[in-house]
């Protein structure tokens, strides 16, 4: 039985090209689904979970995996990440190296673990949500920067945030 593999065909990470070449050699394992949008991916993943799929593979970065987490939370369907993004923080944190063969090996062993998710204003988050300077640095990090500088792009954006006028808040208390 082929595993449904969701591939973010709009992702522009340098790893996406490598993943496509890797996938060409491993298509026998997967039923590849390339949704047209984030909403389309979410709907397809929910449909897979509702139909009782035991597992779905998702190739992409942290943003793509976040969409998958929203769709699959509180279901019995296992998420099998294939790290194809720039940073792949979540995959690294759960022990999946940025190596597609390693991700396939883990999928084939059936090894899984439960992870805690959190929600804010009804939005499910897989690993973190940032505010302030952290969120601004992510906002300033463009695809072009990630392509040229890879992980260093976030450091560069963070430095830019430090040069911006910072908001000021004063709290007063009776004490």
Stretches found by the model and what they are:
Residues 1-56, 66, 70, 74, ...:
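ATP/NTP phosphate-donor binding region
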Residues 4-7, 74-78, 82-174:
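Catalytic core of DAGKc-family lipid kinases
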Residues 13, 63-65, 88, 132:
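Glycine-rich nucleotide phosphate-binding loop and flanking beta-alpha elements
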Residues 58-62:
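N-terminal glycine-rich "phosphate-gripper" loop used for MgATP/nucleotide binding
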